[in-house]
């Protein structure tokens, strides 16, 4: 071994080592891989062309794709340079019997390795071999099909197998910058969710078709997104508490900032029911006679309003009492006659209205039939005897005040012991409403609102009496220093001015401390 063989080893990384082994600038590596575009594809849509045209540089486009691009951008999609539509050259590709592009002179099929050229003056496309042998070497610069003369500069290279840079899709200007022309038909088709379903079987397509026929999601979504109508606040429906929007916006950044307190609006039904103070009266005309009913509108306003509205709507006309149990109840109010149908006047079930002073005691109590708590609709029943165990289960809203003989005749009708259905039909022919307290309440509310419209709000009066913000400044009396001092304040009366006389002041008389008399006692 030689001496001093490690003498040049350093205890640190040298510049040459860092550059070549450990760091330094690396040689450029192309970030994108080469992607070859076939010769029969449009350089803009990257799809097979139908109406081929080319630029003077030999870049091929489809006429249907390049025209909208030029109208919007006016540039060459592959290079980004300016391009005029007049400079485009229409190409005439020849096809063989199998539908393949080929040279019309040598009949050789064009492939990705064929040297393809086009003549500018005619647009005919040939192989370079045919043009070289029959035109260039023969010094006969005439088109091989039309015999039209051309120059050497009119030969445009469409594809050169030795130079494929213009066929590299990764280097296209519109691909790098993600530029494209949006087709209106395609944009409209994208709005349909089925546009994104590429491969579906027949069962899926049939299911989707049925869904689209019955789908109402857009209407429901539009209804939910629509802002609720703001109710008008007046002296009648204004609550003694606010909406709480000020405090909510103060404590939560998700709320819209509010700086003024607004009174909450009392529900219209709650307001109307405050004015209902009377009983309602309805007559049921049955095939067994008439039943006169008194309704407790002042105690159960919601239930009574539902019954009166349905009677006025002639909802019960032609319905039957589908259930009758002797010494218990008779039930009706179902248009289907099955005991499972019927709906309320508002189209949805409403809550129970239990009152401690109303009980199923005695004969002829009118009560609501339901299928559970807060499921009142249109069905009702009339008791034949006391049923106190039904309290707080069914809403009592009236009683029979006339026609007990009719009620007895209805009870005497025999029923099927299995279904409790009367063997003889007990029918409600028509209904008559004699007293409707809700119409009177609506008229009274309308009259009260007319009165309040002519009265000025007390808060508005206070605001009108307050001075405007622009008139709150002090009054000026002159210009310059002391312009705010009233002239009368600078004048003093003669009594207030100090006396200039030299008269000596009178000496104060000391009070005597003698005994005196008893006059001060």
From Swiss-Prot:
Give me the ranges of the annotated region Disordered: 447-521
Under catalytic activity, the entry for this protein gives:
S-ubiquitinyl-[E2 ubiquitin-conjugating enzyme]-L-cysteine + [acceptor protein]-L-lysine = [E2 ubiquitin-conjugating enzyme]-L-cysteine + N(6)-ubiquitinyl-[acceptor protein]-L-lysine
Q: Where in the cell is it found?
A: Nucleus
Residues carrying N6-acetyllysine: 483
Q: Which residues form a coiled coil?
A: 197-217
Q: Which GO terms describe its cellular component?
A: cytoplasm; nucleoplasm; nucleus; plasma membrane; spliceosomal complex
Please name the pathway.
Protein modification; protein ubiquitination
Residues of the PPIase cyclophilin-type domain: 278-433
Q: Which domain of life is it from?
A: Eukaryota
InterPro entries associated with the record: Cyclophilin-like_dom_sf, Cyclophilin-type_PPIase_CS, Cyclophilin-type_PPIase_dom, Cyclophilin_A-like, PPIL2_U-box_dom, Ubox_domain, Znf_RING/FYVE/PHD
Q: Which ranges carry the U-box domain? A: 35-108
An MF annotation (GO) of this entry: ubiquitin-protein transferase activity
Q: Which Gene3D superfamilies match?
A: Cyclophilin-like, Single helix bin, Zinc/RING finger domain, C3HC4 (zinc finger)
Basic and acidic residues: bias regions:
447-462
A GO biological-process term: protein localization to plasma membrane
Placement of covalent cross-link Glycyl lysine isopeptide (Lys-Gly) (interchain with G-Cter in SUMO2)? 216
Its main subcellular localisation, reduced to a broad class, is nucleus
Keyword Nucleus annotated: yes
> Keywords of this protein's UniProt record, alphabetized?
Acetylation, Coiled coil, Isopeptide bond, mRNA processing, mRNA splicing, Nucleus, Spliceosome, Transferase, Ubl conjugation, Ubl conjugation pathway
Q: Does the keyword Ribosomal protein apply?
A: no
- Biological function: Has a ubiquitin-protein ligase activity acting as an E3 ubiquitin protein ligase or as an ubiquitin-ubiquitin ligase promoting elongation of ubiquitin chains on substrates. By mediating 'Lys-48'-linked polyubiquitination of proteins could target them for proteasomal degradation. May also function as a chaperone, playing a role in transport to the cell membrane of BSG/Basigin for instance. Probable inactive PPIase with no peptidyl-prolyl cis-trans isomerase activity. As a component of the minor spliceosome, involved in the splicing of U12-type introns in pre-mRNAs.
* Entry's family note: Belongs to the cyclophilin-type PPIase family. PPIL2 subfamily.
Assembly: Component of the minor spliceosome, which splices U12-type introns. Within this complex, interacts with PRPF8/PRP8, EFTUD2/SNU114 and PLRG1. Interacts with isoform 2 of BSG. Interacts (via the PPIase cyclophilin-type domain) with CRNKL1; they may form a trimeric complex with HSP90.
The protein's name in its UniProt record = RING-type E3 ubiquitin-protein ligase PPIL2
Annotated source species: Mus musculus (Mouse)
Gene it is expressed from:
Ppil2
């Amino acid at each position: 071994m030689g001496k001093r063989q490690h003498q040049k080893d350093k205890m640190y990384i040298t510049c040459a080592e860092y550059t070549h082994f450990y760091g330094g600038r690396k040689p450029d590596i192309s970030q994108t891989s080469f992607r070859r575009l076939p010769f029969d594809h449009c350089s803009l849509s990257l799809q097979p062309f139908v109406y081929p045209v080319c630029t003077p540089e030999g870049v091929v486009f489809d006429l249907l794709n390049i025209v909208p691009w030029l109208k919007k951008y006016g540039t060459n999609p592959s290079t980004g340079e300016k391009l005029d539509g007049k400079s485009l050259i229409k190409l005439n590709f020849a096809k063989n019997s199998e539908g393949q592009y080929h040279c019309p002179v040598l009949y050789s099929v064009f492939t990705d390795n064929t040297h393809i050229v086009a003549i500018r003056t005619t647009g005919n496309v040939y192989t370079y071999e045919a043009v070289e042998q029959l035109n260039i070497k023969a010094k006969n610069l005439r088109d091989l099909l039309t015999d039209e003369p051309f120059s050497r500069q009119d030969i445009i290279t469409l594809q050169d197998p030795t130079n494929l840079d213009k066929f590299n899709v990764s280097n296209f200007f519109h691909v790098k910058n993600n530029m494209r022309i949006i087709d209106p038909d395609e944009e409209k088709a994208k709005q349909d969710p089925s546009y994104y379903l590429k491969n579906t079987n027949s069962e899926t397509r049939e299911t989707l078709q049925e869904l689209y026929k019955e789908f109402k999601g857009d209407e429901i979504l539009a209804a939910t997104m629509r802002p609720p109508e703001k109710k008008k606040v007046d002296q009648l429906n204004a609550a003694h508490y606010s909406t709480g929007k000020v405090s909510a916006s103060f404590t939560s950044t998700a709320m819209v900032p509010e700086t003024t307190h607004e009174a909450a609006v009392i529900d219209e039904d709650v307001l109307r029911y405050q004015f209902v103070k009377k009983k309602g009266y309805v007559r049921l005309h049955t095939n067994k006679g008439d039943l006169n009913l008194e309704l407790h509108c002042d105690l159960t306003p919601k239930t009574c309003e539902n019954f009166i509205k349905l009677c006025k709507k002639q909802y019960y006309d032609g319905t039957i009492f589908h259930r009758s149990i002797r010494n218990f109840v008779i039930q009706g109010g179902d248009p289907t006659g099955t005991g499972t149908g019927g709906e309320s006047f508002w189209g949805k079930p409403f809550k129970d209205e239990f009152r401690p002073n109303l009980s199923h005691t005695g004969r002829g109590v009118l009560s609501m039939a339901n299928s559970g708590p807060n499921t009142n609709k249109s069905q009702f029943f009339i008791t034949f005897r006391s049923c106190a165990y039904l309290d707080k289960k069914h809403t009592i809203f009236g009683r029979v005040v006339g026609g007990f003989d009719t009620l007895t005749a209805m009870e005497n009708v025999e029923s099927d012991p299995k279904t409790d259905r009367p063997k003889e039909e007990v029918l409600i022919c028509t209904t008559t409403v004699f007293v409707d307290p809700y119409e009177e309440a609506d008229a009274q509310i309308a009259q009260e609102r007319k009165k309040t419209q002519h009265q000025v709000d007390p808060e508005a009066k206070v605001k009108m009496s307050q001075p405007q913000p622009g008139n709150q400044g002090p009054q000026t009396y002159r210009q310059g220093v002391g312009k705010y001092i009233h002239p009368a304040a600078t004048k003093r009366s003669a009594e207030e001015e100090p006396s200039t006389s030299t008269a000596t002041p009178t000496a104060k008389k000391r009070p005597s401390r003698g005994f005196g008399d008893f006059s001060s006692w």
